[in-house]
């Protein structure tokens, strides 16, 4: 019997509700910071970075360059997953989670004071890419640790609900980042916003970091991780990520396929559509900034509600339903954009970025972490999650913008791209064994 798996189902009596709540709150607080910082970059890249950091190229190429730097962060996420996962499996989840918040906050604040191309020339985009890489490295270690600590600390029959705070943090981060950018945008002229207004949300990250560190300081390691330490002497002979790859190679491919729906629905609605609707359709930028506010606010309710349903009726059922809703909403979303119908744009944005997206993300924490043994779970789930981020999400706005450019503004290829990703996720979930019922 695999000793690393002995501790995957600890006696329910050892699970402390107090510890579970602190773990859920700490995971949520850190996730808010990391996702606020990470998503803020995507929003600002769509509005500002093409002109502030890439003014020497055409508007279309500037947009592609800005979205390419957005994707750079995703390239460094697997590396963060490997490094933080390795030490998280050896030294504990909490230490790594404190470090990820520090790194993300510092990198984001530095972007807020970064001089533009007109001041320091090509050093501006070089430094921007460097700081974006640090952001990606930090968030690469965040999800695995936060998901594990909340799942391992949760009662057996409420793992989706207690760990949903990791994804609610995404919604709150989206709400805060979009809300602050929208507020600054309304309070400033276009010239003021491009000159200094966009920097304020990046500097505000410092406040969020201090709050998250205070909350996370009260967390404890999970009972499951502490039990696993009995087998640490044997585990030290193996590198955790290698152990995960050797024992569960198929799990990484499953995670990539399962995350396509989540990544494409969110980044097409919140990042790509913001640029496409303003540059190609002539719609006001406030439209998708306000949609981002709405989506972020609703997700704070929909994610825990869907997680509760998943604990009660089955994670896989909820996942498949969400992915199919994304599949069916892909073309109608772009048809609404073409018709410039505000009602239907908002409706299908919610269907994609709230209903479809939130139904799949609410169960990912227990679904993905239970694919791996406890002694290499941080590495396995974390790296798998972040590799999927690169393959399925990091360059989604870039790919979508490139498709629009290649097909001379025609949106059908992007809609098909979105539809295919959601359908692949639905089929993968359908073919999986339901570990919740095992």
Regions found by a protein language model. Name each.
Residues 90-101, 312-324:
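Cytoplasmic membrane-interface "Motif A"-like loop-to-helix N-cap segments
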Residues 102-120, 325-340:
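C-terminal ends and interior cores of transmembrane alpha-helices
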Residues 161-185, 384-396:
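Glycine-rich segments within core transmembrane alpha-helices of 12-TM secondary carriers
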């Amino acid at each position: 019997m695999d000793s690393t798996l002995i501790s995957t189902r600890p006696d329910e009596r050892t699970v402390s509700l107090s510890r579970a709540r602190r773990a859920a709150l700490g995971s949520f607080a850190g996730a808010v910071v990391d996702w606020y910082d990470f998503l803020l970059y995507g929003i600002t890249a769509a509005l500002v970075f093409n002109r502030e950091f890439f003014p020497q190229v055409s508007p279309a190429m500037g947009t592609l360059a800005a979205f390419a730097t957005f994707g750079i962060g995703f390239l460094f996420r697997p590396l963060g997953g490997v490094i933080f996962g390795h030490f998280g499996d050896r030294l504990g989840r909490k230490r790594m989670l404190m470090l990820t918040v520090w790194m993300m906050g510092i990198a984001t604040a530095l972007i807020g004071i970064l001089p533009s191309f007109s001041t320091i020339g090509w050093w501006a985009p070089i430094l921007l890419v460097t700081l974006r890489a640090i952001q990606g490295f930090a968030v690469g270690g965040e999800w695995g640790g936060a998901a594990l600590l909340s799942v391992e600390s949760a009662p057996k029959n409420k793992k989706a609900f207690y760990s949903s705070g990791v994804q609610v943090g995404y919604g709150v981060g989206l709400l805060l980042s979009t809300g602050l950018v929208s507020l600054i945008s309304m309070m400033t002229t276009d010239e003021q916003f491009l000159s200094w207004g966009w920097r304020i949300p990046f500097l505000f990250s410092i406040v969020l970091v201090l709050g998250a560190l205070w909350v996370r300081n009260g967390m404890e390691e999970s009972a499951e991780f502490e039990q696993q330490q009995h087998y640490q002497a044997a585990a030290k002979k193996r590198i955790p990520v290698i152990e995960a790859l050797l024992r569960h190679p198929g799990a990484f491919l499953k995670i990539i396929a399962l995350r396509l729906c989540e990544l494409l629905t969110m980044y097409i609605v919140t990042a790509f559509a913001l640029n496409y609707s303003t540059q190609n359709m002539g719609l006001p930028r406030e439209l998708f900034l306000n949609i981002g506010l709405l989506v972020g606010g609703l997700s704070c309710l929909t994610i825990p509600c869907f997680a509760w349903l998943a604990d009660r009726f089955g994670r896989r059922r909820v996942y498949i339903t969400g992915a199919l809703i994304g599949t069916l909403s892909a073309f109608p979303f772009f048809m609404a954009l073409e018709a410039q119908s505000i009602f239907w744009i908002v409706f299908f944005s919610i269907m994609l970025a709230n209903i479809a997206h939130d139904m799949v993300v609410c169960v990912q924490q227990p679904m993905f972490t239970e694919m791996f043994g406890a002694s290499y779970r941080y590495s396995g789930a974390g790296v798998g999650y972040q590799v999927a981020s690169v393959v399925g999400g990091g360059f989604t706005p870039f790919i979508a913008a490139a498709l629009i450019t290649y097909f001379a503004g025609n949106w059908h290829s992007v809609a098909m791209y979105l539809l295919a990703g959601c359908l692949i996720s639905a089929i993968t979930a359908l073919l999986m064994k339901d570990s919740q019922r095992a």
